[in-house]
Swiss-Prot record:
Coiled coil: none annotated. This is 5,10-methylenetetrahydrofolate reductase. NADH binds at T59, Q183. Its cofactor is FAD. It comes from Salmonella typhimurium (strain LT2 / SGSC1412 / ATCC 700720). Signal peptide: none annotated.
């Protein structure tokens, strides 16, 4: 029987336990619709803010009530935590003048970072008057915002082709976007191939991977089906038989996310955006294991 030399064993332990250098994280939240959801949201923000994320983002609904909730959450985060808070802003349901007014209001209230998106098309609607690239240009006309946009490693469901989707991302970057945050994915190779294609297309901004820690596999599969995200067969097998075992699902989901971050960090990725679904537990545990901790 052979045994590892002590130094070799320690090196193996380190490679299994660590990411490749320091990583940065950011978190996405959505506006709550009930008082109970609001309490959950603020509990999550309070806990995750201790990890000193680069920024946090808040999604933006297609109706005025949800837009107002986004503004309220953004204001609360800034006052309560001092974190950089980035509201999502969509252009599908607003005029250019309305968008300029919203942008000026954000700028005048100290908001410098916006996640610029087209937004979901209403059923039966025709060709939109504005796209995300147009919104980026409009925001840059109003003020020198720091702008994040969306990217799709596995292609946007409405795109005519992967190349057309890539050219759309390039238009957003050429209009002034500072970075792209990807749709969630589970196939690490799809992200790495996409990053290479971005470089080849002359897209020179950071492509931040969006990480979705999965605790409810059925829900994640629905999200994936709607957004053209592939669920690898190995992942389906890992969640098999866990429909009634929520705690084990969380452990499995956390391990998958941690492995993804470790692999990507070894490929030079330093920034990761977590889709929290307004829950702190899994994202906090994942970050802790990866070395992102309070006071560090």
């Amino acid at each position: 029987m052979s045994f590892f030399h002590a130094n070799q064993r320690e090196a193996l332990n380190q490679s299994l336990a660590e990411v490749q250098g320091q990583i940065n994280v950011s978190f996405e939240f959505f506006p709550p619709r009930t008082s109970e959801m609001e309490q959950t949201l603020w509990n999550s923000i309070d806990r995750l803010s201790s990890l000193k994320p680069k920024f946090v983002s808040v999604t933006y609904g297609a109706n005025s009530g949800e837009r107002d909730r986004t503004h309220s959450v953004i204001k609360g985060i800034k006052e309560r935590t001092g974190l950089e808070a980035a509201p999502h802003l969509t252009c599908i349901d607003a005029t250019r003048d309305e968008l300029r007014t919203i942008a000026r209001d954000y700028w005048n209230n100290g908001i410098r970072h916006i996640v610029a998106l087209r937004g979901d098309l209403p059923p039966g609607s025709g060709k939109p008057e504005m796209y995300a690239a147009d919104l980026v240009g409009l925001l840059k006309e109003v003020a020198d915002f720091d702008i994040s946009v969306a990217a799709y490693p596995e292609v946007h469901p409405e795109a005519k082709s992967a190349q057309a989707d890539l050219l759309n991302l390039k238009r957003k970057v050429d209009a002034g976007a500072n970075r792209a945050i990807t749709q969630f994915f589970f196939d690490v190779e799809s992200y790495l191939r996409f990053r290479d294609r971005c470089v080849s297309a002359g897209i020179d901004v950071e492509i931040i991977p969006g990480i979705l820690p999965v605790s409810n596999f059925k829900q994640a599969k629905k999200f994936a089906d709607m957004t053209n995200v592939r669920i690898p067969s190995w992942m389906s097998l890992m969640f098999e038989g866990l429909d009634n075992d929520a705690e084990t699902r969380k452990l499995v989901g956390a391990n998958i996310a941690m492995d993804m971050v470790k692999i990507l960090s070894r490929e030079g990725v330093k920034d990761f955006h977590f889709y929290t679904l307004n829950r702190a537990e899994m994202s906090y545990a994942i970050c802790h294991t990866l070395g992102v901790r309070p006071g560090l």
